[in-house]
Amino acid sequence: MITEDKITEIFCMADDFCKFFDAMTAKYTLKPAGKRKYHRSSTMSKAEVMMIMILFHDSGYRCFKHFYLEKVCKHLHHLFPNVVSYNRLVELEREVAVPLTLFIKKVLLGKCTGISFVDSTLLRVCKNQRIHIHKVFKGIAQRGKCSMGWFFGFKLHLICNEKGELLNFMITPGDVDDRKPLEYKAFIEFIQGRLFGDKGYIGKNLFQRLFVDGIQLVTRLKSNMKGALMSVSDKLLLRKRAIIETVNDELKNIAQVEHSRHRCFDNFIVNLLGAIAAYCLFPKKPCINLQRTIDTQLALF
């Protein structure tokens, strides 16, 4: 659980960002042409709602309602004095989807160091036996197949560096090819150097397109890839691809990005963003030690 001092620090970051976001929104948003609709501002600010979502995914609670009523309203009331009812909080979650996304993209993501890892993980929304009666994500989620078999839901595409910091993420339906997000400029805008992936990212056209943008896509070689060579350092770093698998594991088992209790698509997105934000604020992340040790004891002269 995050300490109270850390909660205050994160809240100040989120509050400053929300104030800047509201100022820019008011400056560039078009005025309504029709009759002005009455809109009552909430007693709980956007930064407080964002902070509650981040705290939930780092608290160990499995039920958001129980966490809010028992933890926030009782034990953290001195940090959140303007608490609202649970039903009202669920309504306010939808309003922070865009600010929370930009807060993650502009503030919480790490920086590229020249060594990056890419992978995708599945997000099931129901069991396979319930696909034909599932209604919450009907028309949005799709059937897909991965190394774990068939599933119904979405894919979360991630890029991280050797420090375990997320560099970017993208959410797609389950039937989207893993290589498809790498074709979008916004997904690889701040990526440079070597990008390591599994065999699912092998593609001649994709390699050439990324190489033009200054990205070298490194994957394991297939038996029919004659004439392809790989340096020793690339082979060693390919063995360390488990770092992004560990990131996926922490997102699922600690931050709870995957469960089947969602009741609408809006809250699914906000909970997913809250989990990603919570992971970005973890004090300890999986990392790789890339320090080189020069030892000449075995050198032959």
Say what each PLM segment does.
Residues 1-301:
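Short alpha-helical elements
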